[in-house]
Amino acid sequence: AASDVYKRQVSGETRGLPVMTGAELAGWRQWLGLTTAQLAAQLGIRDEKRLREWFRGWNQRGRVITIPDGVAQEVAELVAEQEQDAADLAAEALAGDKVIRVPRESDPLRDGMPAEWWMAAAVRARRQHPELRIDWARPATPLD
């Protein structure tokens, strides 16, 4: 779970690296299917420039900066949350018509998460259950 990931990160297995490197943060952002702005919103960070600085590892003045341990913990919790969402999507589809239905990007947030989050979770669910299919939750409209 998230706490296990976090414990491994701070247990010394990182060989002198910070709890989470900028490259790891960027990778988790991509893994979660979120844009930089969306991840900033999930973390309660007002200015997404802060995230970009963490990705790089230095700020605008050229000073080395590290990702705060609390942010690393929050990201680990988001990863665990998405893993649970993927399991829930799979269970729902397996109990029904074997189709995982995902929102379109223009749809409103679902359970506080954007469509990109749900697509990433659906792909993970399908990877675990190849018999499932993924389709849109609603038909396309000219505005999509």
Predicted region positions:
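DNA major-groove recognition helix of helix-turn-helix
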Residues: 54-55, 71, 75, 79
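A short, Lys/Arg-rich alpha-helix, primarily the initiator
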Residues: 8-32
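Short, small-residue-biased leader/transition segments that mark boundaries at the very start
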Residues: 1-6
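Helix-turn-helix/homeodomain-like alpha-helical modules used for DNA recognition
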Residues: 83-144
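Short glycine-/small-residue-rich flexible loop motifs, especially phosphate/cofactor-binding loops
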Residues: 26, 37, 126
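Recognition helix of helix-turn-helix/homeodomain-like DNA-binding domains
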Residues: 44-67
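Short alpha-helical "recognition helix" segments of helix-turn-helix
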Residues: 38-43
